Amino acid sequence: MQKGNIGVTTENIFPVIKKFLYSDHEIFLREMVSNAVDASQKMKTLAEKGDFKGELGDLTVRVSLDEKEGTLTISDRGIGMTEEEIDKYINQIAFSGVNDFLEKYKDNANNIIGHFGLGFYSSFMVSKKVDIITKSYKDGAKAVKWSCDGSPAYEIDDAERESRGTDIVLHIDDDCKEFLEKSTIQGLLNKYCKFMPVPVAFGKKTEWKDGKDVETDEDNIINNVEPLWTKTPSTLKDEDYKSFYRTLYPMQDEPLFWIHLNVDYPFNLTGILYFPRIKSNIELQRNKIQLYCNQVFVTDQVEGIVPDFLTLLHGVIDSPDIPLNVSRSYLQSDRDVKKIATYITKKVSDRLQSIFKEDRKGFEEKWDDLKIFINYGMLSEESFYDRAKDFALMKDTEGKYFTFDEYRTLIKDNQTDKDGNLIYLYSTNKEEQYSYIETAKAKGYSVLLMDGELDVPTASMLEQKLEKSHFTRVDSDIIERIIVKEDAKKESLEADKKEHLSTVFTTQLPKLDKAEIYVDVESMGEQAQPVVITQSEYMRRMKDMSRLQAGMSFYAQMPDSYNLVLNSDHPLIKKVLDDCESNTAEALKPIESEIKGQEARLAALRQAQDKKKPEEITQEEKDDVKNTEKAIEDEKNKKRDVFANYAKGNSIVHQLIDLALLQNGMLKGAALDKFLKRSIELIK
């Protein structure tokens, strides 16, 4: 028996390994099985090169549990190790067998990852003791057993083993007993090893017999050694890709289409990326791309390897050229990664472009599922926008699709305002905003449907990209003020009458939670509705953006602001105005007379003060101005009360307000019930 210390630069490296080297303890199993697979592949390479003349035999890697003994064993029939190799590759932690091996077989080493390196020591994250029982493939080699309890001290002794290969026996630590459970190991093997290039067996298959599961003699192989991405695309059919997608994502809807990646210069990259059906909720779609290194699962956190918007895709990327840290769990940013990201982005945009050109109708049919992905890409990657602007689509409220250039050409003549700005009208809900859409269409305008999660941010982006272009929701104002065709015409209603109308309706507006409503009076034509509610495009857009972007919570806290616009040309509004003036004239006469008198007095007082220096104005004069201002305000409040008392009993005023609120989904609860009862009374 030989004893010694592992060649490490610190006396206690194992606590470091256990706590800090690997982010997830569970990946020890990936490292162990990966090492076994590597050793098996090396054995196969030696046989192919003629450096091993014996029987290759079954190269299956086997994982087994012994709950009674508290051990987990990973066995292979690979190249094994001699005592000298154990001393070099295991005891001297700074060396790795992969360097010697790759140097010898560098011209034929595409599928070789390595043998024992730091990955082996991940076993101590879950083990109180590790045994290696190994026998080299070399003629005359003896079996050797290496044991270590997690300290730098180790023991090497002779062992009994008939065939070449290695058994790694992990004596599972007391605080890691979950790794002695069959379901846990099965789950980890499915996660990390399901596409490894050498068969991996865990127990035996079972069959249902006599009312229970019974083990058969057939190995339970957990992996597919030739996953779809390793095959030549020309040999595959659509059903092959769909079937593989179902293997990866059993509960997902069928993908729209896919891209088979296959490049060997200037970097190695294979894989299949699927376009899923993305309706909403971007965050739920992320982390569906699985990253592999020579068919060994590394991570599904691929933000560092592909642009952010591509994380919405599903599928597999496999590359030995993506740099990993010692734990193989976190990506490092370097030139190769950037090249790979650029390549993938180009392949994705090329695929979308080709589908658009070859099958425009099919592309349009898929647009609702593709839209959020393409919009996200244009918002987050300038290079993707430059490509996508030629195939990204706009959809109008009639269900017709247009490219950016096509739609601009369509609306250019009719929707350019007097200042030369091209106005893109849009709706976020064509049912709720139906009347606004119809009003716009009556003037010959086209209205886009922008009801997706990222449509409004995309509109903001396009305003920056497209010269003199503005996107405005169709209910943000009356249509005459959204697309102003000529200078404002002379008002058809005198200022005092507009004020009377405004006050009548303002006094009867309901108090809404976190919302303010202002009344406006406009000449809109007899055929237009008597009253509509609009909301500022700017404030609504800022509030929408605040839900998607951090740092904009200020807008989210602000109350909603609406305009109740009265159409002074409509017969109902004229009727309210005429009725109001005839019913309030007597009460208003003395009030308005008093207001005029007080306003004239205030003007005289201010004119007198304007001739003096500030220090020459007496306190009495200041108080006189203040008292006169208060007197005017008191009279205006009386005037307001007169209008309020009139409006309170006017069912038409209340009905018009409620109709406008109802049209915008703002009439609810008791107010809605009151409206219904009033409507019935008016019908009688």
Residue ranges of each PLM-predicted region?
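GHKL/Bergerat-fold ATPase module in large chromosome/replication-associated machines
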Residues: 112, 130-153, 173-177, 183-684
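GHKL (Bergerat-fold) ATPase N-terminal catalytic module, capturing the glycine-rich phosphate-binding loop
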Residues: 1-180, 187, 194, 585, ...
